[in-house]
Structures are given as C-alpha cells and as structure tokens.
C-alpha cells in the first residue's frame, strides 16, 4: 500500500518571551527512515522561535534531498474564525491567504523571542470592532485601550465566532482570541503564522497548506502528485498520552503524534483524516478561511 508521506515533522509551539527550553517551549519531533529503511525518531528543543524556524528550514531541506514527501504538523491555528478577513476589510486573495499575509506583515518577532503580538492584537481589535474585543489577554504593562488584561465581554449575536468550527467539534483548545496566559492560542497563531509563510516560501511552490490548497477531503497519493511537503494544523494533545514523572509533556506529545500518523499511513488510513468523504455545509468556511485540525472528526 502506497504511503502518503516518507517523513513526519511535528511542532509543539510556544509564544513564550525570552529564551526557553523544557516545559512550555518549542518542541520538534522528526520521524523518518534511516539508510537501512528502519524507522528512526529524533527530538529537538530550540530555545527561540527564530532557532525553530532555522531548524525547520534545514530539516525540510535535508528530507527533501532524500526524496521524502514531508508532513509538517504545526501545533497552532493556520486560519481565523469565519468572517475575520472581512471584519478587517481585507480583499483580493482568499481569506486564509489575506490573513496569513496580514499577520506575517504585522508581527515582528526578535531573535530573543520578544515580539509585538499585543500591539498587533490591539490594532486588529481597533480595525475590526473599535473596542478591546475580540482579542484579549496581556500583561498589565502591555494593556491598552484596545486590548484588556482580562476578557472584556462574552461573544454575542453579530460578533465574530469565539471558536472555529474544528474547535467547536472537540471543545478542547482555547480560543484564538486569547493572547496571554496558559494556552494562549492567539499568541501562538500570531507568532507562528509568519514562520509558516517564510518556510513555505523557502521550500518553494511544491509545498501546500491543508486544507486551503488541497481541499477538505480524504487524500490519496494521487492528490499529492507534485507536492513535496504538506503543512497542516495539529493539536498534539488530541493523540498524546499523559507524560510520566520526569517527562516533558510537549516532548511526549510530538513523538506520540509522529508515531500515530506514521502508523495510520502504514495502514493506508491517514488519508481519511484530511476531510469528510461526503459534502458538508461547513466546507466553504473550512477551505476558505478557518482551516481544520487534522484528526478532529468532521
């Protein structure tokens, strides 16, 4: 049975400020075949997002030279809730592309891990609603008129959704509008999306971002003809067992996801995770703006 991928790279991400390793930092797991075609695994724990970006570029280039088609699983959102691009009055490309370009242009992340995500969140609030909403969460020193320390109010009728459709399906991840505190998905998205844009550009046109450029549907090997790397959003906690005493949770999770996807691919079952076989009323929102978390059942 033909596999979809020859190698798996899984990233558990962090929006931490300052150099950080260990718990709640960036972990990158890599599963590939060695020269004797035996399965091998390695883990990396770069101290900054800049180091992670450089490492990912190197890893993808090396795997590409080997002739492996690469699955790159990223532990942060690649899209925003439906309607976000329109609320920002962006136009031209597809909404997901508009948002990727907007965030990549606005967010500045220094080699020291210092970044301007709170300023960007405040700017987006001003452009979308003119109030400290929907983005929320910041240290007191970074709070401002358009970004509050705590959530300003609940989402109501007429507001942008608090959660994307895939998040509603599992009710696990925090909202992308949360920029600070534990599980700050918004901080991870704002600092992670520019890296996705740069890595994709470095890897060339033979890279694709799922489901925006592949469709939200089951994938077969023929669907990936001409594709060297597929980028997708993953939620490492979805598959991973609890860490034992002395283990780093994030490290355990990236390995578990690598092993899970490899096992499914070996059985010819991984392709079914990439979307529903039948038509779905959510398809347009998923494919055009929100994306989907791989492994979450439609």
What kind of feature is each model-predicted range?
Residues 2-7, 13-71, 76-298:
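RNase H-like (RuvC/DEDD) metal-dependent nuclease/polynucleotide-processing core
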């Amino acid at each position: 049975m033909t596999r979809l991928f020859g190698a798996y790279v899984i990233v558990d991400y962090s929006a931490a400020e300052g150099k950080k390793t260990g718990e709640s930092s960036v972990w990158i797991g890599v599963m590939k075949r060695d020269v004797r075609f035996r399965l091998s695994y390695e883990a990396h724990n770069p101290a900054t997002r800049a180091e992670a970006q450089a490492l990912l570029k190197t890893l993808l280039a090396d795997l590409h030279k080997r002739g492996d088609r690469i699955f790159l699983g990223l532990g942060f959102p690649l899209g925003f809730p439906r309607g976000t691009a329109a609320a920002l009055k962006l136009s031209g490309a597809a909404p997901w592309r508009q948002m990727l370009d907007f965030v990549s242009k606005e967010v500045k992340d220094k080699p020291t891990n210092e970044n301007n995500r709170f300023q960007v969140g405040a700017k987006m609030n001003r452009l979308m609603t003119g109030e400290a909403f929907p983005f929320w969460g910041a240290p007191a020193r970074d709070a401002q008129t358009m970004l509050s320390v705590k959530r300003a109010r609940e989402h109501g009728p007429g507001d942008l959704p608090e959660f994307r459709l895939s998040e509603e399906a599992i009710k696990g991840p925090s909202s992308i509008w949360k920029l600070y505190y534990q599980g700050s998905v918004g901080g991870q998205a704002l600092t992670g999306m520019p890296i996705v844009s740069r890595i994709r550009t470095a890897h060339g046109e033979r890279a694709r971002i799922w489901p925006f450029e592949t469709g939200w549907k089951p994938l077969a090997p023929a669907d990936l003809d001409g594709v060297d790397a597929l980028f997708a959003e993953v939620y490492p906690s979805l598959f991973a067992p609890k860490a034992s005493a002395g283990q780093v949770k994030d490290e355990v999770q990236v390995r578990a996801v690598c092993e899970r996807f490899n096992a499914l691919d070996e059985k010819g079952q991984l392709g079914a995770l990439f979307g529903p076989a039948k038509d779905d009323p959510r398809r347009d929102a998923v494919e055009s703006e929100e994306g989907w978390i791989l492994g979450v059942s439609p």
